[in-house]
Structures are given as structure tokens and as C-alpha cells.
């Protein structure tokens, strides 16, 4: 943070013998501090600029206050002509190798955890998709088995009816008796097939 000015030649001349500040009767303490500040030469970061005279902002404020109290015609901005704000070079502290290594280790751990989280989500999605397709395959197979069972039931009942109707002609001469006998046999066969079919469906539902 800036706290000083690089004094310009105008301020140095004004404070010297016969300078513009001589008639202003500066307080002894203020003059001594200003002369001490301007007398010290500091070597700045840029060696081409040579030694630099640094004046603190506090001294500049005290000088400004004194000039205002005396109603001086000498303005501060005129005295500061050629002066610049001094910005000290920021020296970066050396990084702790232990801390750097620890930060790198934490960074790698975080990257690995993020990678595992992403791949875990992908694996879960693949498993869910695989489970859905497997369930769909089971449902299709169950539906196919049900259709075949119903078809076999109908074929068996019809075959029982036809066989009984044709075979009963040697026992019954009337068509009504032959039809009744065929219906009775077909019903018995149908009930037996229905019982077997229901038991088979219960077993399949139990497996699901």
C-alpha cells in the first residue's frame, strides 16, 4: 500500500535555502522532518532512476495544514509538481515446498474422487438399462408361453369335442345325443386343461 511520495525537484528546491517555503516560517519540527526525509536517499527497484527521496503522506498533510492556516498563496499541488506516488515493490514470500506438495496431493485426490463419482453414475445407468431389457425379455417370454398355452387349450378342447362326436355315432343314433356326449367330454377335458394351465401360470408368477 502506498504511503510515501517520490519528491520532485520542485519540492526539494522549495525547502532549500532561499526556496519558496522559507517565507512560510515552517515549524521547526516540520522543517526538520522534511529536511531529514529529503536528505535521505533510497535506492528504488529501478536502478536507472537513481537514488530516490521519499516523503511520507503524513508530512505532506502537515505541510498542507500549515499552509492553509497561514492563508499562504503557495499551493500544495504546485509544490508537488514532478512528484510521484511511491509504490514499493511487493516481494513474494517463497512458497513452502511441504505446503505445495500437500496441495498437489489434495488436488489429485479430488480429481480421483470426481472421476470415480462420474464413472459410478455411468455404471449405475448401464446396470439399470440392462435390468430393464432383461425384465422386458422375461415379460415377452411369459406372454409367448401364455399364448401357446391358450392355443393348446383351445385345440385340445376342440379335438376332444370332434373325436367324441365322431366316435359316439356307433353308440348314439340321434345327433342331439352325440352333441351332448361331445360337449360333456370336451367340458371335462377343458376343465382338466384349465386346472393344469392355472397351476403352471401360478408357478411362473411365483418365479417372477
Swiss-Prot record:
- Which species expresses this protein natively? Pongo abelii
Q: Which GO terms describe its cellular component?
A: COPI-coated vesicle membrane; endoplasmic reticulum; endoplasmic reticulum membrane; endoplasmic reticulum-Golgi intermediate compartment membrane; lysosome; vacuolar proton-transporting V-type ATPase complex
Transmembrane intervals: 146-166, 178-198
Chief subcellular site?
Answer: membrane
Q: How does it assemble?
A: Accessory component of the multisubunit proton-transporting vacuolar (V)-ATPase protein pump.
Name of protein: Vacuolar ATPase assembly protein VMA12
Q: What Pfam families does this protein map onto?
A: Vma12
Q: Tell me where it resides.
A: Cytoplasmic vesicle, COPI-coated vesicle membrane; Endoplasmic reticulum-Golgi intermediate compartment membrane; Endoplasmic reticulum membrane
Q: Which UniProt keywords apply?
A: Acetylation, Cytoplasmic vesicle, Endoplasmic reticulum, Membrane, Transmembrane, Transmembrane helix
Where on the tree of life does the source sit, at the highest rank? Eukaryota
> Which membrane topology term applies here?
Multi-pass membrane protein
Q: What gene is it encoded by?
A: VMA12
Alphabetically, the GO molecular function entries are: oxysterol binding
Amino acid at each position: 500500500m502506498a504511503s510515501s511520495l517520490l519528491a520532485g525537484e520542485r519540492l526539494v528546491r522549495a525547502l532549500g535555502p532561499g526556496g519558496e517555503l522559507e517565507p512560510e516560517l515552517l515549524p521547526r519540527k516540520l522543517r526538520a522532518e522534511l529536511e531529514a526525509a529529503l536528505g535521505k536517499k533510497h535506492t528504488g527497484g529501478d536502478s536507472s532512476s537513481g537514488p530516490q527521496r521519499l516523503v511520507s503522506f503524513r508530512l505532506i498533510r502537515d505541510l498542507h495544514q500549515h499552509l492553509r492556516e497561514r492563508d499562504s498563496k503557495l499551493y500544495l499541488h504546485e509544490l508537488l509538481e514532478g512528484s510521484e506516488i511511491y509504490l514499493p515493490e511487493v516481494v513474494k514470500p517463497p512458497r513452502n515446498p511441504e505446503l505445495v506438495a500437500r496441495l498437489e496431493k489434495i488436488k489429485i485426490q479430488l480429481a480421483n474422487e470426481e472421476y470415480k463419482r462420474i464413472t459410478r453414475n455411468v455404471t449405475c445407468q448401464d446396470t439399470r438399462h440392462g435390468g430393464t431389457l432383461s425384465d422386458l425379455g422375461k415379460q415377452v417370454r411369459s406372454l409367448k408361453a401364455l399364448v401357446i398355452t391358450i392355443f393348446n387349450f383351445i385345440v385340445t378342447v376342440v379335438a376332444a369335442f370332434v373325436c367324441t362326436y365322431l366316435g359316439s355315432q356307433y353308440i348314439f343314433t340321434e345327433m342331439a345325443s352325440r352333441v351332448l356326449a361331445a360337449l360333456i367330454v370336451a367340458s371335462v377335458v377343458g376343465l382338466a386343461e384349465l386346472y393344469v394351465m392355472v397351476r403352471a401360470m401360478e408357478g411362473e408368477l411365483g418365479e417372477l
